[in-house]
From Swiss-Prot:
Source organism, top-level taxon: Bacteria
Gene, per the UniProt record: mdtL
Alphabetical UniProt keywords: Cell inner membrane, Cell membrane, Membrane, Transmembrane, Transmembrane helix, Transport
Protein name: Multidrug resistance protein MdtL
Cytoplasmic-side segments: 1-3, 63-68, 114-130, 179-216, 268-270, 316-332, 379-395
Annotated TM spans: 4-24, 42-62, 69-89, 93-113, 131-151, 158-178, 217-237, 247-267, 271-291, 295-315, 333-353, 358-378
Length: 395
């Protein structure tokens, strides 16, 4: 079991590392490529577009050919794309590399969740996904710090050499440590309830959890996207203050994420999901009424706590009905989350909504819609249970 957890964590970490590690070098990258920082900020959207593109195909391929091949190819693509970014001499080539980085990270991301669905029952899966969320919260803090330390002595290209090395490590783990987890067969008693036809993506429960997780990701990505403007321009923080604040928010996320598995032993998953949305609603109201930086910071901490306590539980419930189509289900969730959050951020920018109002709007909207869905759509207890996986290969 440890090998699956290790590989799943490594596969997921490529996604946030690809977002956060290069940001500290953005001014130098822009100068060397004769582009403005504003022009290169589109690299974030390009990266997410690459992820969404990979997710369109990775899940189905993983269900048909196995998790391991997709993980290996995704890691190789991420590694090669990182090298392409490091060799870029102009903006379009750099953005092409960023798109391909997203493709590699997206494939690995989908496989990680499919592996956890294959190998864990619902109760343990919710706990592990909460821990995984806590570990990924470390990356937005450590990646910029690591990038800053690297750039003290080396050029910005070294940031992408580091990401390329991460791709190599993940590829080696996938090749030599990861075992195939795709179910080879099901017992006859499970065929009727776990056939591909029975595991339809168009059912009320899956769609409800897809909506909840998409709105939750939209909240956290809106916070990440709006945080520089909100903290440094609106609240007047320095770059150092900004870094400290983001470290504190990540710390809150880690503490809550690592505490959630213990909470699952005491409370029902639905209770934690309601607490999550209650924290989002409280954060939205707090930010809308805030007149001091202290109150605003408190509202931001509530956002991180709300996401951490509920996202893993909701993702576990969303994947629960799927054993034969875990890859497709994971892809669908990933695409919805990436595209939904990007659409909200883009629409808010087009409409000229301020950073604060953008954040307040998604917080209140997410909480109201999600609470209604949690109360109106309960888990279907007849869904397929976790299967013991007959390993197809020991390689």
């Amino acid at each position: 079991m440890k090998r699956f957890l290790l590989c799943s964590f490594a596969l997921v970490l490529l996604y946030p590392a690809g977002i956060d590690m290069y940001l500290v070098g953005l001014p130098r990258i822009a100068a060397d490529l004769n582009a403005s920082e504003a022009q290169l900020h589109i690299a974030f959207s390009v990266y997410l577009a690459g992820m969404a593109t990979a997710m369109l195909f990775a899940g189905k391929i993983a269900d048909q050919s196995g998790r391991k091949p997709v993980a290996i190819v995704g890691a190789i693509v991420f590694m090669m794309a990182s090298l392409l970014c490091s060799r870029a001499s102009e903006g379009s080539l750099f953005l092409s590399g960023r798109f391909l980085q997203g493709v590699g990270a997206g494939g690995c991301y989908v496989v990680a969740f499919a592996i956890l669905r294959d190998t864990l029952d619902e109760h343990r899966r919710a706990k592990v996904l909460s821990l995984l969320n806590g570990i990924t919260c470390i990356v937005p803090v450590l990646a910029p710090v690591m990038g800053h330390l690297i750039m003290l002595r080396f050029p910005w290209q070294s940031l992408f050499y580091t990401m390329s090395t991460m791709g190599i490590i993940v590829g080696l783990l996938s090749l030599f440590i990861l075992r195939e987890t795709r179910p080879a067969r099901l017992a006859p008693r499970d065929l009727s309830r776990s056939s591909p036809a029975a595991e339809s993506l168009v059912n009320r429960f899956f769609v409800s959890r897809l909506a909840i997780t998409t709105l939750s990701v939209s909240v956290i990505l809106t916070f990440v996207n709006a945080s520089p403007v909100l903290l440094m321009e609106v609240m007047g923080f320095s770059r150092g203050d900004y870094a400290i604040t983001m470290a504190l928010t990540a710390g809150v996320s880690m503490v809550v994420s690592f505490s959630t598995p213990f909470a699952l032993g005491l409370f029902k998953p639905r209770t934690l999901m309601l607490v999550s949305q209650g924290l989002f609603l409280t954060a939205g109201v707090t930010l809308s009424l805030a007149h001091t930086n202290t109150v605003t910071l408190f509202g931001l901490m509530l956002i991180c706590a709300g996401f951490s306590v509920g996202f893993g539980v909701a993702m576990s419930q969303a994947l629960g009905p799927f054993s034969l189509r875990a890859g497709v289900a994971s892809s669908t969730l990933g695409i919805a989350q990436v595209c939904g959050s990007s659409l909200w951020i883009w629409l808010a920018a087009i409409l000229g909504i301020s950073a604060m109002n953008m954040l307040i709007g998604i917080l209140i909207g997410c909480s109201i819609v999600s609470i209604l869905l949690i109360f109106s759509v309960a888990p279907n207890r007849s869904v397929a249970e976790h299967e013991e996986i007959p390993y197809q290969s020991r390689s």
